Amino acid sequence: MHSLSKSAMFRKGLVYSFPIVMAYIPVAFTFGVLARTLGFSEVEAMLASLLIFAGASQFALITLYSQSLLSAIFIPIFLNLRHIIYSSIIAQKLKLRFPHISAFGLTDEVFAVSVNSAENERFLLGLELGSYSAWVGGTALGVLAGSTLILDRDVYSALVFSISALFLVLLLPNLKGRHVRAAVSGGAVALAFHLLNLTSVGIIAAALAGPLLSGWDGE
C-alpha cells in the first residue's frame, strides 16, 4: 500500500506539470531554433537543455557566448543563484532521499507549484520529470527545425516572456501576508538595479532583500 501511495503521488506530480509542459514546449522550441541560428551544433544545443535545464540562463549563454566567454559563464551563474533559496525552502518542506536529482529539476515554475502542492518527494520528482521532458523535447523539435525557420523578433520575445508570465501566475495565489511585502520589496530592488543596467546583480539583491525587508515588523 505504501508503494502504491508513492506511485500515485509521482503520477499526481506528472499531472500537475501539465501547465508547465504547455509553456515550456514553445519556449524550448525557440531555444533550439535560436541555438542553431547562432551557429551551435545539434549536439551542443541538446546538451545545453539536457545538462543545464535553466531556461533564461540558456538563452543568455548562447547569446553571450560569441561576445564574451566570461559573461557567458558568469551571468548564467548569477541568474541561477536564486535556486539556492528555492532548494533550501524545499529541503525544509520535504524529506528528500534524492536531493541532487530534486535540486537539478527545480526551476522557477516547479518551485512555484511545489512550494504549496508538493506532499512528498515523489510528487516533486513527477512534477520535475514532466517539466524536464517537455523542455528537452521542445529543444529537440527546435533543433530539428533549425535555421529553416525565420524567427520573428516579436514572436521570440513573446515566447521567452511566457516563462516569466507562467511563473507569476503560479506564484501569485501563494502571496499572502508578509509574502506580499517580500514580493513588493524584492520587485522594487530588482527594478532599481535594472534601471541602473545591473539586472543580473538585481536578481540576487532582490532575492536577499525581499525576505529581509518583509520581516521588519517582527512577524
Swiss-Prot record:
Superkingdom to which the source organism belongs: Archaea
Transmembrane segments: 14-34, 37-57, 123-143, 155-175, 189-209
Keywords noted in UniProt: Cell membrane, Membrane, Transmembrane, Transmembrane helix, Transport
Cell location: Cell membrane
A GO CC annotation given for this chain: plasma membrane
Stored InterPro entries: Brnchd-chn_aa_trnsp_permease (IPR011606)
Gene Ontology BP annotations: L-valine transmembrane transport
Membrane topology (UniProt): Multi-pass membrane protein
The keyword Isomerase is assigned to this record: no
Family the entry assigns: Belongs to the AzlC family.
Name this polypeptide is given: Uncharacterized membrane protein AF_1755
Organism: Archaeoglobus fulgidus (strain ATCC 49558 / DSM 4304 / JCM 9628 / NBRC 100126 / VC-16)
